[in-house]
Amino acid sequence: MAECGRGAAGGALPTSPSPALGAKGALKAGAGEGGGGGGGGRLGHGRARYDSGGVSNGDCSLGVSGDEARTSPGRGPLGVALARTPSPAAGPVPRDSKPGGLPRRSSIIKDGTKQKRERKKTVSFSSMPTEKKISSASDCINSMVEGSELKKVRSNSRIYHRYFLLDADMQSLRWEPSKKDSEKAKIDIKSIKEVRTGKNTDIFRSNGISEQISEDCAFSVIYGENYESLDLVANSADVANIWVTGLRYLISYGKHTLDMLESSQDNMRTSWISQMFSEIDVDGLGHITLCHAVQCIRNLNPGLKTSKIELKFKELHKSKDKAGTEITKEEFIEVFHELCTRPEIYFLLVQFSSNKEFLDTKDLMMFLEAEQGVAHINEEISLEIIHKYEPSKEGQEKGWLSIDGFTNYLMSPDCYIFDPEHKKVCQDMKQPLSHYFINSSHNTYLIEDQFRGPSDITGYIRALKMGCRSVELDVWDGPDNEPVIYTGHTMTSQIVFRSVIDIINKYAFFASEYPLILCLENHCSIKQQKVMVQHMKKILGDKLYTTSPNMEESYLPSPDVLKGKILIKAKKLSSNCSGVEGDVTDEDEGAEMSQRMGKENVEQPNHVPVKRFQLCKELSELVSICKSVQFKEFQVSFQVQKYWEVCSFNEVLASKYANENPGDFVNYNKRFLARVFPSPMRIDSSNMNPQDFWKCGCQIVAMNFQTPGLMMDLNVGWFRQNGNCGYVLRPAIMREEVSFFSANTKDSVPGVSPQLLHIKIISGQNFPKPKGSGAKGDVVDPYVYVEIHGIPADCAEQRTKTVNQNGDAPIFDESFEFQINLPELAMVRFVVLDDDYIGDEFIGQYTIPFECLQTGYRHVPLQSLTGEVLAHASLFVHVAITNRRGGGKPHKRGLSVRKGKKSREYASLRTLWIKTVDEVFKNAQPPIRDATDLRENMQNAVVSFKELCGLSSVANLMQCMLAVSPRFLGPDNNPLVVLNLSEPYPTMELQAIVPEVLKKIVTTYDMMMQSLKALIENADAVYEKIVHCQKAAMEFHEHLHSIGTKEGLKERKLQKAVESFTWNITILKGQADLLKYAKNETLENLKQIHFAAVSCGLNKPGTENSEAQKPRRSLEAIPEKASDENGD
C-alpha cells in the first residue's frame, strides 16, 4: 500500500518503493514513513487540504452564496422554565443575508457547488460560543423555538433554503415560505407520525442530488393520514440531532410537553449533583470554594482540564457581575451540566429511553441487543451494568442509567472498539508453523539506529514483553573469549552474548507460551562458537528444541506442539559431515544481500563469489527445524527444499518477488517459512511496510521495534488479534493447498465475499497538543483520518473536516464507507492530526485488525507515537459491517446489502480444455446459480423490508421491528398487527382494518419471510451439491499434469489449465462458504425478529412463554408518501 499513514517516523528506502505506492486524491507520496511526533522522519504524504465541490461529508451546508442566504427572523428564546440555557443550534447568521426580508427566488439550489469559506484564526480569552452544550430536551425545544435555517428537499432535485421554527405554544412546526400562504407552510405537531433520521424516504432515495447530502445531516418528518414526508437537511449533524430529538419529544408528550419539561428540571441527575455539592459544603453555608468546586468536577470527569473548569466559573460570575470566588449550588450544577454533558451521548440516550432522561433495564437491553450486537442479554445483565456505572444511589436503587452513567459505560473498556474475544488466544494453534504470521524483531539488540546507535539488553526485554516470537542475535568474537552482540562493521556498541541469553531465558515466555525463534547471525570463531553453545545449553536447558525433523512429514510442527520451546534458526552442517566442524555460507545479511543483488545484475551468477566460514558441530546440532539456507528460485525450492529449511529475503528482493511472482510467493509460503528483513540501506533503522509481505504470506517479517511510526503501528496492531501471543493464523486462502490468490489483486478475491465497513466518526475527547509542536498555547484544530491497510484492492483513506480550536470535545459527525475485499488481512487505523501545527501535527492513533472490530457505538482509545495510551483521549465512533459472514462470532450481527437482479452476477468457472475435468465443473454451475439466487433473494427481501421501515441497509431486523412496532398499535394501544411466534417462520396477522401503508409493510414482511424460509430449507442440499463437485474435481488434482499431457496440452496451455483448476476449486469452496454463512445470517435474522416481537409486546398471545412487555413508543417507522410541497 502507499504509505498513507500519518505520524510515522523514519526514512523510506529509495530503492524499494512499496508496490502499491501511488497518490490518492490530493495526497502526494513522498519519502519517509511520515514525520510524526518527534520521530525525526519526513512526512510520508503531503498534508491533505481538500476544497471539494458539492456537499462535504461532514459540513452539511449545500453551499449557498451571496443573496441565496437569508437571515433568521430573530425569534427570542422561550420565556418559560425550559429556557435554561441559550440555544447553541441556531447557528450564525450568513454574512450576505438580507435583514428582515424574505429570501429571494435564488434560494433554490440546483447544484451543490460549495464556495470556499474563509478561515480566520482568532485568539479568545473565553470559552468558544459553540461549546454551549445540549444537555436536555428543554435545550432542544428552546433551540427550535429560536429557529434554524434548514434545506427543504423536493423530488425534482431542487433544494430550498427555509427558516424553520417551532411556534411558542409548541403546537406547530412552520417555515417562512417564499411566496405562498404562510398557513400552508406549517405542520401541526399532532399530525406528525414519525421523525426519521438519514436519507431514508423515497424523496431522498430517488433524488439526483442525494449523493451530495450528508446522511448525518438529513432527516424527514412523516405527517398526515397519507404519511407525507417533509425532507430536510441541516447545516450540521448537531443541528439535525436537535430537531430530531425535540420533535420526537413533542410527539411523545403532546400537550403535556411543557409539564414534562418543567418537571425534568428536578431530575435524578440534578439531585445527585446537589448531593455531591452538599458533601463538600459540610457546614451548610450554601457555597464552596472555587478550588473545591473545580476538584469535585475533575474527580467526576478526570479528562477535563483544571483551567477550563476555572474559566467556566469565572465566566459565569462575570455574566452575573458577581465578585469573589465562592460557588453556589446553582452555579455548581450549571457548570457541571455544561462541561460534563456530551450532547452526542444525550441524543443517543433519548433514542432508546422513549424520551426519558434515563435508560431503564429494558431500554438498556434493547440498546445492547439492537445497537451493540450483544447476544443473550437479560434484565439481570442490564442491572449489573447499571450498578457498575451509574453514579447516583437513586439510579442504582431504581435500576435507572442516567446520562452520566450511560457516558461512563460507553467510555469504559466494555465499549471499546476492540473485541475482547481477541484479548485471549482465539485461533486454532494446531496448524503447521508455516501457516502463521510470526511477530518478529530485527536487530533486537539496538535501541536506536543501526549505524552508530547503542546496543542494550532492554531491546530484548521490550520486544519479548510485546509478544515478539522471533529475535535476532548478531554474534561476533569478543574480548576475554566471550562472544558479543552488535551490528558488525558499524559503530554500534556491544553487549555480552551470555547476558542476552540470560534475559531471553527470563522473558522468553513472559507474554506468550508459544515457541520463540532465535535468529543467530554467527560470525564467531570455532572457539567462541563453543562458548555460545555452552551458554545456551546451560542457561536455556530443556527449553531448547533439538529434536530432529521427521522425514516422513511434509509440514512443520504446530505452535501448540512447540509450546515453551526455543528454536534456533541458523546454519547447519550437512548430514554427511563427519568431522567436528565444517564450512557453510556466511550469515552476514548485508554481505548476502550484496551477493544476491549482484546475481540479479550479471548474466552468469556462478561468477559471484560466495563467502564461507567454519561452523562447529555442537552449534550445528542445536539447529533443528529452522535450518538457514539460501533461496535459489521458486521452482527449485518446490522440488528440493525441505520443510524445515528457512530462507531469508532482503526486503528489496522480497518486494521484487512480491511484484513479479506473487502467486509463486504465496504458494511457497504455504509450506516453508520465509523471513524478510529490512535493507541494510536503512541505516536510520526505519521500517518497511509489513503488509507488503504479509499479503504474500511471508511469516517472519522482521521489524525495527526501536523505531516508532506507522509501520510499527501496523505490526503492533496486527498481532493484538490473537491474545498478543505472537502468532496469527493466516487467511485460509493462503493456507489451502489448492487456492487461487494473487497478492497484488486490485479487485475482489475469488471465493471471498467483500464486506462493507461503515464508520461514523462522531466526536473526540481530550486531545492533547502534539508533543513536538512549536505553537504556543494549548489550542488544537483536530481532524481525523480513517485508513484501511491491506491488499491493494482494500487500501483507502478518508478524512473528516477540521474542527477549529477545540481539542477537548470536537464534534465531527461524519460517515465513511469502505469495501473490504480480504477482511482477514485488513487493518483499520484511526489517526488524529492538528491542522494548525508548527513542527508536528501528530496527536494520536489507534490501529486495529478488521476482524477485531466491535460493531455499534464504541470508543477508540488513542495512543501516542510510541504506543503509550494517551490519558482520557479517545474517539467516539459508530461501526457497522454489512454483508458480513455469519460464522464463528454469534454476537456479531450479520447484515446484508441489496443488489438488483439486473446486476446479479453469477460466479464463473473456467474451462481447462480437459474433457473429464471440465465435465465435473460443468455439473457445478447449476448449484452455484441456486446458491447465488438463494443468498441474493434473501438479501434483497431484507433490504426492501428495511427501506419500508424507514431504515438504511446498515440496520438489522431487530431495529426494523422496533421501528414499525408503534404504528402497529391502535388508538386504544391494542395491536393492529401481531406476530405468531408459534411457527418456525413467524407470520404477521392483522387484528383489524389497517391503512394501505401498513398492509404494504405486512406484505413485504411476508415476502421476506418466504425468502428466509427458502434459504434455510434449501441451503443444505445446495451446499452438499457444491461440496460434492469440489471433492470430485479434487480427485484429478494429483495427476492433473499427466491428464493434461495426454489431452495434448503443451507447456503454456498446461500451466493455464492448472491455474484454471485452482481458480475453479477456490470458487467452489467460496460459494459453499458463502451459502453456509448466509444460512447462519438468516437464522440470526429469525432470532432478532422473535426477540423484538416479544420486547415490543407484538407477539400473539399464547405464542411466547415470556411475559408480554408493555409496548413502548419507538423512534422510527412507516413508509411515507412525498409531500405535495404546498408550503413552498
Curated annotation (Swiss-Prot):
GO terms for molecular function: GABA receptor binding; inositol 1,4,5 trisphosphate binding; phosphatidylinositol-4,5-bisphosphate phospholipase C activity. InterPro entries: C2_dom, C2_domain_sf, EF-hand-dom_pair, PH-like_dom_sf, PH_domain, PI-PLC_fam, PLC-like_Pdiesterase_TIM-brl, PLC_EF-hand-like. Ubiquitously expressed, with a strong expression in skeletal muscle. Residues 619-735 form the PI-PLC Y-box domain. It is found in: Cytoplasm. Residues 1107-1128 have a biased composition (Basic and acidic residues). The keyword Cytoplasm applies. The modification Phosphothreonine is found at residues 85, 585. Residues 427-571 form the PI-PLC X-box domain. Keywords: Acetylation, Cytoplasm, Phosphoprotein, Transducer. One of its GO terms (cellular component) is cytoplasm. The modification N-acetylalanine is found at residue 2. Residues 20-30 have a biased composition (Low complexity). The keyword Cytoplasm applies. May play an role in the regulation of Ins(1,4,5)P3 around the endoplasmic reticulum. This is Inactive phospholipase C-like protein 2.
